[in-house]
Amino acid sequence: MPNEQASEGDSGAGLIRGLGLKEAVSANVVEMLGIGPFITIPILIASMGGPHAMLGWLLGAALAICDGLVWAELGAAMPGAGGSYVYLREAYGPNKMGRLMSFLFVWMIFFTAPLSVATGAVGFAQYAQYLGPEISPLATQFIAVGLCLLITFALYRGIRTIGRLSFILMLIAIGTILWVIVSGLGNIRADLLFDIPEGSFSWSWSFVSGLGGAALIGIYGYGGYNNICFLGGEVRNPSRNIPFAVIASIAIVALLYIFLNTTILGVMPWQDAMASQHVVSDFMEIIYGSWAAQVLTYLVLGASAASVFALLLGYSRIPYAAAKDGRFFSVFAKLHPRKRFPNVSLVTLGLASTVFCFFELGDIIQALIVIQIIIQVLGQIVAVTLIRKYRPDIRRPFQMWGYPVPSLVALILWLLVLVSTGATIVGLGLLVLACGIGLYMLRARLVGEWPFGQPIGGP
């Protein structure tokens, strides 16, 4: 059938294009509406010390929209499995610097993919404590490990089944947030919502740093709008569906987050919300009592598990794309013989994520964002311009609105987020970058690739 053709060649041996528009939007929204908004609200408020920390969600939304347009243009132009791996390779030259950039991206994935999955799993385990007696940190970490393994098992199946499951999980996640919003709308108090401490808006480094920290948490909450780009080889009509899925998912989630935070800060004093470890459950307990808080907690845990599901689904396609291209270990190019999904890549990243479950949640989030900015995000913003100027052979069915303004705004906001994290975390990100460059140069020297030579038949 035309809707289920293989994405590579006509042999039927490649990935299956089994995701339509509905499933594409679902794959993004499910990842974005994970545990993030439920566990990061207190961290967001603490970053600026008051309800004006809502600016973090607004700044995060602006950054997501501008960066989302970068993803939409690149995703529509090069809709193969692997996302950024393909974009960086083609933009910087497939037999020149593109080899280094695409290698660095795959190198980064072996840090950011497990880090991303671990944030959802650790958040799940921490939030689950609302339902029972307090447990030790070690027990919490092992609950997170168990979730990683369970999700890996759940993903060990064909893409059409996963697409339908993603849509169901999206409905659960959206329903959970809508219940919170509707429950609180009639109870919002303006005096709580605008209880902003005196002197909060002073244009000092402290304010800028706090705003950058709030934006970092905000963009973490929006993370996932690019998920469908990593599944580009499995999307039907990708030149249309990928840009639409990116933009629609950001719009849906931005509205939900802004209403969610307005509702919570209008019902709970911001000091109480900042101190809560289960802020949404505490909110529902204020409105309805403990029964509603417990029901909501189960729904939050379901949304969290759904996010981990979507994260691991998207990331597992990246080592596959690199290995199939001959740029990574060939074992990762293997597909399941019957259901045709990258089983080796999936299992490897699923197991690797269990290691990061033993780190602190805040440290995981910061490390994740910084490594992504340094290696992937900045290189990809430049990639849009490089393709427009030097690769007229690449068809661009979707073009960024108002180019180059969105890409420049995204660049400035990402740099603001980067400098607000502090020298230690940025230094660790640069260390990961340096190690990746060193590994690439060693490999390139051994096999005679750029910059030491050209592959046979290369330009």
Task: Enumerate the language-model features and the residues they cover.
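Membrane-interface "cap" regions at the ends of multi-pass membrane proteins
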Residues: 1-51, 65, 69, 96, ...
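Helix-loop-helix junctions that connect adjacent transmembrane segments
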Residues: 10-15, 54, 135-139, 168-297
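Select transmembrane alpha-helical segments in multipass membrane proteins
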Residues: 18-28, 54, 62, 94-110, ...
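Hydrophobic transmembrane alpha-helices that form the core helical bundles
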Residues: 43, 56, 65-148, 153-156, ...
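TM-loop-TM module centered on a large, flexible mid-protein loop between adjacent transmembrane helices
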Residues: 86-94, 129-134, 200-202, 245-312, ...
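Membrane-interface loop-to-helix entry segments
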Residues: 139-194, 205, 223, 246-250, ...
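C-terminal membrane-solvent junction of multi-pass transporters and transport-like membrane proteins
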Residues: 165, 331-341, 377-426, 446-457
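Hydrophobic alpha-helical segments of multi-pass membrane transport proteins
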Residues: 176-180, 319, 368-396, 433-452
